[in-house]
Amino acid sequence: TAFVLSAMMVLSLAACGAKTETPADTSTPAADATKPAEVAKLTYAVEAGSAGEEVALANGYNVVSVDSQAKALMEVQAGTADAAIIDSLMAGAMVGEGTSYPDLTITDQKLTEELYGVGCRKGSDLASFINSVMADAYADGVLEATAETYGVQAALVEQPASEFTASESDSDVQYIKDKGTLVIGITEFEPMDYQDADGNWIGFDADMAKLVAEKLGVEPVFTVINWDNKVFELNSKNIDVVWNGMTLTD
């Protein structure tokens, strides 16, 4: 199983659906997701293996599971789902006027709140290394400045002081240094991990992962993974770290 690091942010989940002001000659708008009587009739698009899927199933919602939060929004846009349950930070970046989904809206339904961190192989000293880098970045203001760049500063939690402790044997940190790359498993998740116009990975998580790679003296390599397979990808060493909104209960 994966070992999850100390919390970096507090995230909540948001339900996103069609605007009720959609003209009558277009597709029928979704019902108000805040009304219990209507919730049972709705179909929610969720990312497989995510906290959103867990919450939806626990509440008895009808769900369609897809392999990314971005695709959950696509399901709503296409009319194959009434609403999507995604992380609130992503909803704020991708839903509403001036975004990729201007015809969708975020409901005021607060589903859950969670702490998230970064996932490494169980027992990996990379966890200790990343914690030390994040602690330093918090202390010198780099973490907050990066969060402000992507509008997520309100979700930051304090990073306690931490010193790196290397493993005496089977060191992941040494393994990564020897091969010269830090392979970062992600899913596309604006404003955390997404591509700019030139195809470069940017976002709060992406920039923090690049900082860790810099401190390791290696090149960062981003690879999109199936979120449901994250533990397998880690344990098989296809990736070195999962860095994309991983909840601390994973």
Where are the predicted features?
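A ligand-binding cleft/hinge motif common to bilobed small-molecule-binding domains
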Residues: 54, 74-78, 82-112, 229, ...
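Short loop->beta-strand "edge-of-pocket" segments that line small-molecule binding or catalytic clefts
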Residues: 36-48, 181-186
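A bilobed periplasmic-binding-protein/Venus flytrap-type ligand-binding module shared by bacterial periplasmic
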Residues: 113-133
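Bacterial lipoprotein signal-peptidase II cleavage site
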Residues: 14-24
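Secondary-structure junction motif
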Residues: 45-58, 88
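Hydrophobic core
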Residues: 5, 9-13
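Extracytoplasmic small-molecule ligand-binding "clamshell" domains
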Residues: 25-34, 59-65, 75, 87, ...
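Periplasmic-binding protein-like
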Residues: 129-154
